[in-house]
Amino acid sequence: MKITLVTGTNTDVGKTIATAALVVRLQEQGKSVAVMKPAQTGEPEGSGDLATIHKLTGLDHLYECARFPEPLAPDVSAQRAGVSLLDFDDVVERIVGLEGKYEHLLIEGAGGLLVRLGAQQQPKRLWTLADLGAELHSRGYDTEFLIVTSTNLGSLNSAELTVEALRHRDLPCAGLIAGSHPTHAGLAEQLNLTDLPRVTDLPLLAVIPEGSGKLSTAEFRHASQQWFS
């Protein structure tokens, strides 16, 4: 089972729509695919990122590990709600339990790469999506990261910092996806489509137009095939 961890340079850069587009792309390649969201915050039951992915793609193989009420980092939201933090080993075991069921697992993070998602007992610390990727990589899984970035002014620095954090941990990154690219792009947005791969030395795999999350399932499945280079 190949595992792709979808992270972002920040919150609200388009990770969920990018993950949905990856679902369609993998399905078009004939792959069986599932999506996991370790921690969802700030959404009532029946809504959230996995619900959006289901709406856009029709995919039913969706796994959410924990949900916390306030739209904050998962560790903070859990603490404020007075509930247990998401346990690292539990998430790893849920992923291991999917082995053999799917050819490809997409794991969508929360916010950026180093957002604290929960607690790890050994060693005792808070854990991030980077920690999860490192653990899966060490277990021999074919693991890669994808970085979803905005294209607005300031995106180059945010993307470079995220890439540097992955390289510092020797974690493989397959490339970048430009999320929610404006229809009427300004100068910075236009230039960043060229500059992002130049400064990160990673390919820009797709450019997703803003408003794509409002498409119907059929519209999304058709349109998303045109976004990848």
Give residue ranges: language-model regions:
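Glycine-rich phosphate-binding P-loop
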Residues: 5-19
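Short internal beta-strands
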Residues: 35-37, 146-149, 172-180
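C-terminal lobe/tail of nucleotide-utilizing enzymes
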Residues: 163-229
